[in-house]
Amino acid sequence: MLDPITFTIEVPCNQQQAFETFADIGSWWPLDKRSASMRVEGQTAKSVSLTPKSGGKVIEVTQDGTEYLWGTVRDYNPNELFSMEFHMGLPPVDPASLVEVRFTVVDDERTRVELTQSNWEAFGDMAEMMRGGYGGSWGLLFEEAYKAACAG
């Protein structure tokens, strides 16, 4: 069994803003660096968005309107917890990897945000490679892009 990867950051905004910014994934996700469109077509995706509810979908839209399913929302508890079954444009696997994001108040203007990705075994023979790839990618995505979006 492969260990989960966990990243913890502190963002300069309140808990509600931290959660809402994360949920507005299209406003901060660097589609020119990490997307199914870049991997498959060599183009920047048009958008990525999520339906904000349990069972909602996280979908990337390409420049020509093709949709890639990134995952399915499991938990959508505003200001506290967001989780999704995640496979980012790969053919859906069941079970998928799991991304959980927890939001904890530090004070009125700061929030601790912890992102954990687990269940690597869902990727079968590619599990170790996927874990290694995402381990590096979350630094750019979460620690840089998301944190910068929270700072405004």
Tell what function each PLM region has.
Residues 11-13, 52, 75:
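Conserved strand-loop elements at the edges of beta-sheets that form or border functional pockets
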Residues 49, 59-110, 118:
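Hydrophobic-ligand binding "helix-grip"
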